[in-house]
Amino acid sequence: LSIRRQRQMCIRDRRPTPDRVRETLFNWLTSADGDWSGWQVVDAFAGTGALGFEAASRGAGRVTLIEQDAGLVAQLSASKARLDADAVNVLRGDGLVALGRWGAGTANLVLLDPPFDVPWYGQAIAAAQKALAVGGWLYLEAPRAYDAEEIAALGLQPYRYLKAGAVHAHLLQRIAPQP
């Protein structure tokens, strides 16, 4: 049972990933690899934290929510306490910088949903790819679709894609580097 269904996320001034998109994403991940235990999840631009809290509710071993806005960080911390989400760690900081410093190859899932108006999607995807273990997953929410050639150039392969309104939702998997 998802945390969203257990309790409404209550974050002022932010809209989480649409319910239908979030449900589809987690169905994709569960069908690909149903065992979440031990997963290290990074939600680099947490916002409401809906995606990260959902990963925790599915049994992820450790979920790190990174958010720059101090007010949102306080609200995320309050949600963590209210939901008794022990696997969740809330950090205040820049998601792009945090991903750049993340241990290489240590994340099983990176949730990447930066504001649509930023010019550095490519940098964020590259930093997320570096953080991922081989076979790890990158969920990318973007204002446009990325084609398979762009994705492959970043060391990733497309797994699933969904368009819902203005949201282009990509589930990508890190592939082993070519010798």
What is each residue range found by the language model?
Residues 62-67:
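Conserved SAM-binding motif I beta-strand of class I
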Residues 76-77:
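Conserved SAM-binding loop
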Residues 1-11:
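Single conserved hydrophobic/aromatic residue that forms the stacking wall/gate
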Residues 48-61:
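Conserved SAM-binding loop of SAM-dependent methyltransferases across substrates and taxa
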Residues 132-138:
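Short glycine-dipeptide loop
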